[in-house]
């Protein structure tokens, strides 16, 4: 990228990054969530096709597209519906770094990795899946687009 303008934080910035559009154009003009004190506005990444993601464009161009990490673009869509062929991560907002039950593997027919009790740490696991996706693209002999979105920068541990 030679130019990217970030006019919002968090969810709207993710929508901006994935589409190249301003957050209000993506349907996500404010932080996604259900907090009653938050102003009403644009809630949720539009799942219709008028805002194409970079993953959709690159998938159509023959890339292997994968995402590992935090989605948090509303519940109207998910990474698979928006051009990613493989996904592992947190679909919603902040949650535990140590509880594998709150993380999702998509498409749904994929078997998630198993971690012994006490060994799961989200940043490491998100990285493990990213490496798996790199290996998968290599095996399929396809160029790779990997969107890696760690949750760790959001809160102190």
Task: For the regions a language model picked out, list residue spans one by one.
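Formylglycine-dependent sulfatase
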Residues: 1-157
């Amino acid at each position: 990228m030679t130019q990217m303008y970030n006019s919002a934080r968090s969810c709207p910035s993710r929508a901006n990054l994935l589409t190249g559009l301003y957050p209000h154009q993506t349907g996500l003009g404010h932080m996604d969530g259900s907090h009653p004190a938050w102003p009403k506005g644009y809630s949720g990444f539009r799942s219709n096709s008028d805002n194409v993601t970079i993953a959709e464009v690159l998938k159509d161009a023959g890339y292997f597209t994968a995402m590992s990490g935090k989605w948090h673009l509303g519940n109207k869509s998910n990474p698979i519906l928006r051009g990613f062929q493989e996904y592992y991560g947190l679909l919603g907002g902040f949650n535990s770094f140590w509880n594998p039950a709150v993380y999702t593997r998509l498409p749904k027919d994929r078997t998630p990795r198993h971690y012994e009790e006490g060994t799961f740490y989200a940043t490491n696991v998100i990285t493990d899946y990213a490496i798996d996706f790199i290996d998968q693209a290599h095996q399929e002999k396809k160029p790779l687009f990997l969107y890696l979105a760690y949750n760790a920068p959001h809160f102190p541990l």
